[in-house]
């Protein structure tokens, strides 16, 4: 029996030395130490031995078992270390090689233009005011002198949440909130998103950006309005840009006007973009209607003011020569990477 145990030990050692993988080690373990393994069978047969042989053989069998278990454990560790070394060698990074450049995004042309517009007005002493995009009917229409039956209040032009709440159609409500909460003199701009129930095409979008401005003080005249907007146009588009004012109608200003600028495509020569006129509509403006001032508890006999409003998307298109507003919202990297 002792000779058989020595044979098992030597056989196991030889097989372990020749093993190259964890799977082979597991096969050897099962062969000798498993439930039906060779060493296990000998241990189960010890009952047939004499009382004198049993403790001697049992001691040798346990020593062989412990030796095989320890040898398998060491072999597992050696193979694991070899695999780790091979993996590290294959995964070695050459730190002298140039790294991969991180893809860095760029600022959107809308954001760039908004910042330029803000900077110009801030340099002229304007403050920036904000307000909610979900607005009360009172602020979006009533306080701006837009009556119940006005066409702009129809569902074809306005997104209604309920009878009293709308998605703001302009940033003018911010002007009302500012006049309610601040005393003149007031000199502010209100940039932000607005919503109109428009079909999407090259010049229309249901969501777009607008910037409105308001000045209220004693002795404000249309000349102040004209000078402010002409200065803005020159700083935004260059000293060569020309502007002109045309009479218009807005319910919240009186008198009202629209300001045109020389076409950014043809420089005033006439083209398809400006329909041959050499001019492009830039903004709406006018003197604040006396009733709007009264609605905000400002006495129109003491104070006067002017207001104006830009479509920021239109400004972007003019500044960069873009002929389709949809390009600003489609997240096409071929387009956005140009800025």
UniProtKB/Swiss-Prot annotation:
E.C. no: 6.1.1.20
Classification via CDD domains = PheRS_alpha_core
Give an example GO biological process: phenylalanyl-tRNA aminoacylation
Q: Which domain of life is it from?
A: Bacteria
Q: Which GO terms describe its molecular function?
A: ATP binding; catalytic activity, acting on a protein; magnesium ion binding; phenylalanine-tRNA ligase activity; transferase activity; tRNA binding
The UniProt record gives the binding positions of Mg(2+) as: 254
Cofactor annotation: Mg(2+)
Keywords (alphabetical) are: Aminoacyl-tRNA synthetase, ATP-binding, Cytoplasm, Ligase, Magnesium, Metal-binding, Nucleotide-binding, Protein biosynthesis
Tell me how the cofactor is bound: Binds 2 magnesium ions per tetramer.
Q: Name one GO cellular component term.
A: cytoplasm
Q: Which InterPro entries match?
A: aa-tRNA-synth_II, aa-tRNA-synth_II/BPL/LPL, Phe-tRNA-synth_IIc_asu, Phe-tRNA_ligase_II_N, Phe_tRNA_ligase_alpha1_bac, Phenylalanyl-tRNA_Synthase, tRNA-bd_arm
Protein family per UniProt: Belongs to the class-II aminoacyl-tRNA synthetase family. Phe-tRNA synthetase alpha subunit type 1 subfamily.
UniProt subunit comment: Tetramer of two alpha and two beta subunits.
Name of this protein? Phenylalanine--tRNA ligase alpha subunit
